[in-house]
Design a protein with these regions (language model features):
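N-terminal pre-ligand scaffold of iron-sulfur
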Residues: 1-63, 81, 95-118
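Short, P/G- and charge-enriched loop/turn segments at secondary-structure junctions
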Residues: 8-9, 87-89
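Mid-chain, well-packed structural core segment of small domains
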Residues: 58-88
Length: 118
């Protein structure tokens, strides 16, 4: 069984962009958000640590672009785009669940597992 969740072309994800893909084999219908910030790709489960609801339904609205933070559509919680830690809102100090990302040969690969910091 593979740990790979998604493989996408690098050019599909621009700086301060976000894409949403299905999380395979989950009974809850969870999705994965893939973001690019300061050139680095990161992936998060689309679930707010405040109440488990989706951060967004449309990735075009995930970013709070002035502050360059990820924003939950429900309670406007703001998350650090590098660490996933909530900086403002009802879940301050809690973190999004991150996934492993690797960008190589013009492809972004998202895999199950906890990412290394950075």
């Amino acid at each position: 069984m593979s740990n790979v969740i998604a493989i996408i072309k690098s050019e599909e994800l621009v700086e301060l962009g976000a894409l949403m893909v299905d999380l395979p084999q989950n009974a809850d219908g969870l999705k994965v958000l893939i973001t690019r910030f300061e050139g680095k790709v990161r992936a998060w489960i689309n679930s707010c640590p405040h109440d488990g609801s989706p951060l967004c339904r449309d990735p075009a609205f995930l970013w709070e672009k002035r502050k360059k933070l990820l924003q939950c559509m429900n309670h406007q919680a703001l998350f650090n785009a590098k660490t996933g830690i909530c900086e403002e809102g009802p879940c301050k100090g809690k973190s999004l669940y991150g996934l492993i990302t690797k960008e190589k040969n013009n492809q972004i690969i998202v895999s199950k597992g906890e990412p290394k910091n950075g």
